[in-house]
């Protein structure tokens, strides 16, 4: 069977060691069992902390294991199924399949597991979860992880008070964080200094290292602000951003395996957007006096305070190609009287859908763009390797030819599930 394992999940470390020794890596895949097993499997644990130990800690007792002379690894006694085998030295194409970001992952070569045994309990149940654009069933895991790890955040990331990997954006594409800005308390104007150190720390360890857009605000500027209040967070950030100072790109970096917006598989860019200080601008909720836009752009809509969404022409360029039409749009907006009131402009294929609600905006804007390739700006320049602009900031969130296709629900299956949840159905009251 194909062994699709994503980067920064830990198994690659063990696989690399086995290859170094010239050995095939033994693998046990456990399915089902107590809920603590499932939570431990998706928990972003530090390297060296066993999922078995964490499952025991979470479940309140040691996880029972069974040792067999026929298997090199122990078997979880309470698991419903155990698939045992070794990783073969060659690769095979795997995919496509639906993912939790809301797309069909494309076909790629991955390691192959030679299955040698399958064990199961009496009356075993094979659990599964439906995937697709969030929120889905696995959203509750993300909420639970935030609840479990919230108190640990300041200990793991010095100077960080709160983080929120935004589920509506697909989790890894967007990370919001509140931090402290204490490096130079004697300065008259607060500016992001400690926040940048904290952002780089978050991109250097744990699962936050896979974040694509890292938006960081200073707790001192708004003590009541919370990272989980996404609309308020964006408003706070857009009111304070200095576009000549606050955007920091990391190019050709490591990205999540499921993100197809970047340079290649597992490779793309990141953007640290860190703002601190006093409010700079008033944001608008209504669009006025928009200049005549370049051909193909239109249907202006407001997605939130200071966020303008435009329909754009179909994207037909290749990876990492600068779109002259986006640069033309940026130049056009330089003459817009409301340019400061709408500091963020998102270009999408369907402006009405993107602006219909804030979750739509988050999903489209951050799951369909790569910072280095898709961020433009009015008056953009590069000085001393630092990209800046006068504003507004433009984000090209159109679907590109090399993107994974969006996951679409099968209406026949959807009706069957709805029937199960209807009054009198076996799942009535359990699902909505």
Per-range role (PLM):
Residues 33-432:
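Charged, compositionally biased interaction regions
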Residues 1-32:
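Internal mixed beta-strand/loop scaffold within catalytic domains of large alpha/beta enzymes
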């Amino acid at each position: 069977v194909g062994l699709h394992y994503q980067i920064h999940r830990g198994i690659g470390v063990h696989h690399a060691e086995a290859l170094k020794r010239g050995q095939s890596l033994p693998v046990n895949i456990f399915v089902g069992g107590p809920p603590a097993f499932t939570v431990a499997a998706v928990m972003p644990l530090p390297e060296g902390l066993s999922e078995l130990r964490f499952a025991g800690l979470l479940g309140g007792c040691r996880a029972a294991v069974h040792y067999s002379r026929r298997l090199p690894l122990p078997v979880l006694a309470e698991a419903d199924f155990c698939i045992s085998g070794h990783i073969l030295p060659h690769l095979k194409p795997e995919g496509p399949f639906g993912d939790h970001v809301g797309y069909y992952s494309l076909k790629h070569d991955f390691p192959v597991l030679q299955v040698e045994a399958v064990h199961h309990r009496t009356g075993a149940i094979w659990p599964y979860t439906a995937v697709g654009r969030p929120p889905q069933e696995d959203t509750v895991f993300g909420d639970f992880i935030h609840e479990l790890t919230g108190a640990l955040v300041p200990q793991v990331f010095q100077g960080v008070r709160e983080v929120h990997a935004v589920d509506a954006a697909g989790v890894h594409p967007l990370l919001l964080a509140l931090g402290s800005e204490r490096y130079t308390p004697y300065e008259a104007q607060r500016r992001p200094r400690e926040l940048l150190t904290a952002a780089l720390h978050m991109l250097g360890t744990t699962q936050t290292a896979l974040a694509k857009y890292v938006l960081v605000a200073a707790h001192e500027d708004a003590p009541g602000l919370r990272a989980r209040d996404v609309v308020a967070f964006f408003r706070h950030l857009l009111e304070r951003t200095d576009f000549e100072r606050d955007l920091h790109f990391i190019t050709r970096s490591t990205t999540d395996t499921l993100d197809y917006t970047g340079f290649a598989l597992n490779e793309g860019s990141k953007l640290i957007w860190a703002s601190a200080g006093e409010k700079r601008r008033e944001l608008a909720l209504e669009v006025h006096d928009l200049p005549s836009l370049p051909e193909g752009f239109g249907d202006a809509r407001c997605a939130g305070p200071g966020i303008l969404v435009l329909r754009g022409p179909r994207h037909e360029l290749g990876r990492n190609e600068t779109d002259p039409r986006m640069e033309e749009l940026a130049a056009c907006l330089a003459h817009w009287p409301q340019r400061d009131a709408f500091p963020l402009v998102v270009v999408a294929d369907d402006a009405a859908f993107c602006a219909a609600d804030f979750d739509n905006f988050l999903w489209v804007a951050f799951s369909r763009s790569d910072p280095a390739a898709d961020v433009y700006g009015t008056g953009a320049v590069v000085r001393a390797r630092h990209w800046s602009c006068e504003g507004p900031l433009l984000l090209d969130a159109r679907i590109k030819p090399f993107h994974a296709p969006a996951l679409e629900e099968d209406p026949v299956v959807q009706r069957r599930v709805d029937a199960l949840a209807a009054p009198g159905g076996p799942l009535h009251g359990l699902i909505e």
